[in-house]
Amino acid sequence: MNKLEKNKKVYNAIDYGLNPKNKDNSEELQTLINLVHNNGGGVIFIPIGVYIFDSAKSSWDMTKNITAICEMKSNVSLIGESLTDTILKVIGNTEKGSALFCHNSEFSKEILHSATAKNFTIDMSEASLNQYTHRGKAFYYSGIKDCVFRDLRLISTPSTALGIDMLDNVVIDSVYIYEGGRSWNYGGNGGAGIGIGTGLWENENYVIRNCICVSCGHFGIFLEDQGIFHNKENFPKGQIISNNIVRNCRHYAIGIRGGDTVLVSANNIYNNNGGLYVDYGARNIIFNGNIIKSSKEAAFCIGNEDKIINNNSKECENIVLTGNTFIENKINLLKDSEHLSCIEKNNIFIN
């Protein structure tokens, strides 16, 4: 607390109505977020405890595609007292799912900025939906700058756990995700551990590092150009996915759908249905120094998923696969490998 207070005004959430004894803390937290934002910004400090958020009671439709519990505002940071013992627990049944923290730049008429989330757990294992959609996330932001997501645990989200789109100068660091996309089935949208939609700016610079994604649905980590839904190629430049662990995912570990100038390096990927994946005309993508082990499908795949979506068969360009290690992958090492521009100095064992 004292260290935080040197930089920004700190609001102890307990002093503003949040309480582990409450049956629903949604209204109290939203009121506090609004207060901090209107006062010029600061830190909401959440002490140790389990805080309930009732999605059945407190969800509301932000847009026709987004159902929210709390709306995040600029210059408001959330920091917990304990990574494992400050728990925001979402419960309740909704028709299509709802997200605990939402922001949409078209709805709010502003880009979200300076909103850090750090050192707490979001547990959605008791939140359910009747019809699977992409809505049931821990974080659901669109249009954000200058934000940090660090030291978080995101548990059993029905849809993507950290589903944040259109990022610039954003760091995602040391986030543990278990069962992101718990309710996802093949053919559904979203359902990843970390899912980043791209395509608002020419340069969308962000880093995903030191994260652990376990038993996720569609992908462990997934970058997706949103032009695919409008038959366009936006392909913003400049992302890094590095030093992450992805295991036991039901589809592929790391996927790049569209995009330009992406570095995927030094990731430890094992026991997934598939390893690395690119499609929708992605270009200038470098996969370097990754370990891909015990994939049930391809350890590396170029573009054969969902071709019915606006010509997803667009050919990828300048895909580089170098310095990776492939171990005991059961089926294909490569699919459509003729599109690779460079394959060199990879290690292959017992494939």
Indicate residue ranges for each PLM-predicted region:
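Extracellular beta-strand-rich solenoid/capping regions of secreted or surface-exposed proteins
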Residues: Q30-N39, I52-I79, I87-K118, M124-K145, ...
